[in-house]
Amino acid sequence: MHVLVLGSGQLARMMSLAGAPLNIQISAYDVGSGNVVHPLTQQVLGHGLENAIEQVDAITAEFEHIPHDVLDICELSGKFLPSTAAIKAGGDRRVEKALLDNAGVRNAKHYVIETREDFERAIEHVGIPMVLKSALGGYDGKGQWRLKEAAQIETIWAEMAECIAATPTQAIVAEEFVPFNREVSLVGARGKDGSVEVYPLAENVHTNGVLSLSTAIDAPELQAQAKQMFTAVADSLNYVGVLALEFFDVEGTLLVNEIAPRVHNSGHWTQQGAETCQFENHLRAVCGLPLGSTKLIRETSMVNILGEDTLPEALLAMDGCHIHWYGKEKREGRKMGHINVCGDYPGELHRRLCALAEVLDPMIFPAVHEFAKQAQR
């Protein structure tokens, strides 16, 4: 089997690594240059989307923000999975909110803003405090505002108006502020036959709006809620592939915050912690193969490496520590790689995370150090 991935970043890279044992070949389409590249070496293999489509058995995507004309060409080939509707929902918060409402899935009260009058109506409908997010292009905390009090209205509107004017068809989605206890996510896969397999929930810690630490957790009641909502969303889209739902945990009740129609950062722990990793299961799904087991085989946490291209060599000598570099050029705040930390018996993962904190810079890895502090109390 030969799969073309729209996008040539780290997710395509990790799909390639996961596909090799199954004899699934991966090529990546660089949306910016129009080149088809090898996802590991970035060697140019060809140019032009139409030629690439003819040479593969299936097409999928590693991110949501893909030009619609590219998606439409892929959809016409009959080889693209999941559907373009799913990708577009992940790339436009207006479509995403409508999808969640239509699927009957709990999410925060919301209102779409295109004009100053809409902003006033949103304040009346949603209330203050509220969170405001750009409908298009926002991710990892970008394109977001928090309206905490009426005194901020004029300043925030000026910034949002500039955002709306800068991009055709842009809008802002106002959401009710949700006082959540923690953020969790569910990554799962749906096959061509409608079968569903979900991984254990992961508890997520963000730093400046970017995921920094993700840990698989055992929470049966939350797991049941999350799986029900995952299935509702996936079935409504007739989804094929890996899908991620991000939730707010509000006193034991889950509300969907966002969906991601692709393999997801909070699922990277599955590379060492699950029977079948998310990347392999995505390829299994889009290639029409049976889904693999999502069973937890060891307690695992994932630590993002942000803006750094080196780590202390001591990590390589640590038991249960697995480093995954993405081969990227160093840039401040950029996701350069991740560390998976595993434990084989109760308490071992906590001990190893505390050991990790002793060798990692607290300014670069604050979430790991905060975890260690909490563990010592």
Curated annotation (Swiss-Prot):
Q: Which InterPro entries has this protein been placed in?
A: ATP-grasp, ATP-grasp_carboxylate-amine, ATP_grasp_subdomain_1, PreATP-grasp_dom_sf, PurK, PurK_C, PurT/PurK_preATP-grasp, Rudment_hybrid_motif
Pathway listed for it is: Purine metabolism; IMP biosynthesis via de novo pathway; 5-amino-1-(5-phospho-D-ribosyl)imidazole-4-carboxylate from 5-amino-1-(5-phospho-D-ribosyl)imidazole (N5-CAIR route): step 1/2
Output one GO MF annotation.
Answer: phosphoribosylaminoimidazole carboxylase activity
* Record has ATP-binding as a keyword: yes
Where does the record place the ATP-grasp domain? 97-287
Give GO terms for biological process: 'de novo' IMP biosynthetic process
EC id: 6.3.4.18
Q: Name the coiled-coil region(s).
A: none
Gene Ontology terms: cellular component: cytosol
Q: Tell me what reaction this enzyme catalyses.
A: 5-amino-1-(5-phospho-beta-D-ribosyl)imidazole + hydrogencarbonate + ATP = 5-carboxyamino-1-(5-phospho-D-ribosyl)imidazole + ADP + phosphate + 2 H(+)
Residues reported in the UniProt entry to bind ATP: 93, 133, 138-144, 175-178, 183, 206, 257-258
Query: Keywords on this record?
Result: ATP-binding, Ligase, Nucleotide-binding, Purine biosynthesis
What family is it from? Belongs to the PurK/PurT family.
The protein's matches in PANTHER family, at most eight in alphabetical order, are given as: PHOSPHORIBOSYLAMINOIMIDAZOLE CARBOXYLASE (PTHR11609:SF5), PURINE BIOSYNTHESIS PROTEIN 6/7, PUR6/7 (PTHR11609)
Q: What does this protein do?
A: Catalyzes the ATP-dependent conversion of 5-aminoimidazole ribonucleotide (AIR) and HCO(3)(-) to N5-carboxyaminoimidazole ribonucleotide (N5-CAIR).
Provide the assembly information: Homodimer.
Q: Which HAMAP family match?
A: PurK
> What name is this protein filed under?
N5-carboxyaminoimidazole ribonucleotide synthase
Origin organism lineage: Bacteria, Pseudomonadati, Pseudomonadota, Gammaproteobacteria, Vibrionales
Q: Which gene encodes it?
A: purK
